[in-house]
Amino acid sequence: MAAMRLTLFRIVCLLPGCLALPLSQEAGEVTALQWEQAQNYLRKFYLHDSKTKKATSAVDKLREMQKFFGLPETGKLSPRVMEIMQKPRCGVPDVAEFSLMPNSPKWHSRTVTYRIVSYTTDLPRFLVDQIVKRALRMWSMQIPLNFKRVSWGTADIIIGFARGDHGDNFPFDGPGNTLGHAFAPGPGLGGDAHFDKDEYWTDGEDSGVNFLFVATHELGHSLGLGHSSVPSSVMYPTYQGDHSEDFSLTKDDIAGIQKLYGKRNKL
């Protein structure tokens, strides 16, 4: 169980002392409910320093969040801060720039297997299969890794849709908010990518959540990437609503993944 918790990059601190000092708000523009939502957001996505074992000020964590998103580092809640906090996003905590996951975990085999074990009812199964294949190809075009799908048994990356508590200690929260999460490369749950079944998943339509975009993001985590602070990056933590069919990895995404695996030789 301990290993399971440490595998996911989204290790959430739930201890009451994690956010030791209360947040303040600018000009009374934030409601009590939003104040509570902000505290919960910082507990989830901006973790305390486990090495020093010191209680972390909520103000410091808010400044860290403001720095990540390119906002003035006031340490105070504002409507702009709340707007970002309320956007749909990935369930993995934020780091900085194109960053890698702690200890830079990666796959050491040149062939990585994957298996899709459950589906959304919003899209035909064959289309989900095609989208996952396309998302993985975006990454494999940049690095010397190949992906092989298996239909049964074990696989390096297990992909599926689930709702609520789905057995990994990180339950989904219904429509909106957390869209999915993924585990760093490794044994057991390592590499697995989960998507919230309660979202309305689409294939690039004007409404709903673009599955290709979110799948590409989560599978980036499955390969070892953390979040990027570059808004145009696929690895940016909040959902950008990019519905275009021809979106691609940015220079930031490519730099991150090639730092882990090197470049694919072009013939």
From Swiss-Prot:
It is found in: Secreted, Extracellular space, Extracellular matrix. Its main location: secreted. It comes from the Eukaryota. A motif (Cysteine switch) lies at residues 88-95. The keyword Phosphoprotein does not apply. Ca(2+) 2 binds at residues 173-174, 176, 178, 196, 199. Its cofactor is Ca(2+); Zn(2+). Keywords: Calcium, Collagen degradation, Extracellular matrix, Hydrolase, Metal-binding, Metalloprotease, Protease, Secreted, Signal, Zinc, Zymogen. Residues 1-20 form the signal peptide. GO terms for molecular function: endopeptidase activity; heparin binding; metalloendopeptidase activity; metallopeptidase activity; peptidase activity; zinc ion binding. CDD domains: ZnMc_MMP. Zn(2+) 1 binds at residues 166, 168, 181, 194. The active site is at 218. The keyword Mitochondrion does not apply. It is an enzyme of class 3 (hydrolase). Ca(2+) 1 binds at residues 156, 188, 190, 192. Belongs to the peptidase M10A family. This is Matrilysin. It comes from Rattus norvegicus.
